[in-house]
Amino acid sequence: GDYIMPYLGASPDSVRNGKINYLINGDMMIDQRLEGAAYDAGDNNDDVYTLDQWIILSESNDGVDVSRDTTVPSSGAINSIKLDLEIANEMFGICQIIENKNCRDIIGQEVTLSFQAKVSNARIGDIRAYILAWDGTADSVTSDVVATWNDDANPTFATNWTAENTGADLGVGTSFAKFSVTGTIDTSSTANVAVFI
């Protein structure tokens, strides 16, 4: 099937500039559950953890096969996550929720989510990225952050989740390129932060 391949590891530039990467396993190196095998046939159902710390979210179960892959940007990366579309027109994404103790110092701050991505076929369109704030009880989050998928538009997020940036189609092409979204985590009573692509 057609696929998307994001890579969210820290770049040498971000390390040199003193920026902190709050995401765990952004370089997709760790896969304790299946040790590199594909997540499919139930392992890839909606709202299931796949590569360490990454949750697959999709309209239906078994709509997207997930695997660690060695196709990477030319930035010294070793792995990426491969999201292989199994159902035509399936809407899906990956999400990571940051624990309260690990995100306290970015609440109230402007933050940027940067990643590199490519698609196998230009017909996979409308890829968006979000920085989300959770204003419910700390670390008792709704991990399925999407309440309603909306065709070619921003999803409606689940109760207590707020997008801190405005989503827009990033125009991901068939070669790796860097994409960034920025937002201020200013939702009142934010207790957790997440990213969703």
PLM regions: where:
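Short, Lys/Arg-enriched N-terminal segments with co-localized hydrophobic residues
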Residues: 1-4
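Extracellular and organelle-lumenal recognition/adhesion modules and their flexible linkers in secreted
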Residues: 6-197
